[in-house]
Amino acid sequence: MNMSYLFFFFFIQLVLKYINSKVTENTICKDGFLIQMSNHFECNCNPGFVLTSESTCENKVECNANSLDKRCGDFSKCAYKDLQQKELTCKCIDGYDLEESICVPNECKNFRCESGKCVLDPKQEAKIPMCSCFIGIVPSKENNNTCTIEGQTECTLKCTKENETCKKTSGIYKCDCKDGYTFDKEENACISFSLFNILNLSIIFIISLIYFYII
């Protein structure tokens, strides 16, 4: 076996390990952001992006003649609707099944969690389905570990940017700007409302001056 083949083999193994790696509080979500529920972490994508793996987002496309195999939704791609290959539709990728318009792991098909969602146990190498609850709810041992009782989950997200903190939003934890600050896309940072308002007023003033002199 020559060295180039060995190198290629190990490179492929590293890529597969990265793609299939579990999402933790240390995961960096490409073109997305990390959230936490009661029993797991996951990446959510920025607007206009969809999940292609547990930690990677890509541009979302509409299925048409030029978008075969491209990503049209989380864990889904554009594929031919039938064997006649005349029409493309958005289908779940291998390993996922469609349930209530969402592509879920095969093992989570028909797996009910009540106030939460089915995920694959991040502590197991095998694909074992389990419930992860919305923040404020925890699994109940009396009810097959479904999300049915109130309970607290500590936020362990690493919100390290300046003026950033962990916040509960719509049943999840995520890193967000502290009270009194707002996120500025151009600066990619949380800035104070007062500074944000000053910048906006300055822009409005400059535009008004330009408009005045043109007219």
From Swiss-Prot:
Pfam families: Plasmod_Pvs28. GO terms for cellular component: cell surface; plasma membrane; side of membrane. Residues 29-58, 59-104, 104-148, 151-191 form the EGF-like domain. Gene3D superfamilies: Plasmodium vivax P25 domain. Keywords: Cell membrane, Disulfide bond, EGF-like domain, Glycoprotein, GPI-anchor, Lipoprotein, Malaria, Membrane, Repeat, Signal. A lipid is attached at residue 192 (GPI-anchor amidated serine). It is found in: Cell membrane. Residues 1-16 form the signal peptide. Residues 193-215 form a propeptide. Disulfide bonds join 63-78, 72-90, 92-103, 108-118, 113-131, 133-147, 155-166, 159-175, 177-190. The keyword Kinase does not apply. SUPFAM superfamilies: EGF/Laminin. Its main location: membrane. Glycans are attached at residues 144, 163, 200. The keyword Manganese does not apply. InterPro entries: EGF-like_dom, Pvs25/Psv28_EGF. It is a lipid-anchor; GPI-anchor. This is 25 kDa ookinete surface antigen. It comes from Plasmodium gallinaceum. The lineage of its organism: Eukaryota, Sar, Alveolata, Apicomplexa, Aconoidasida.
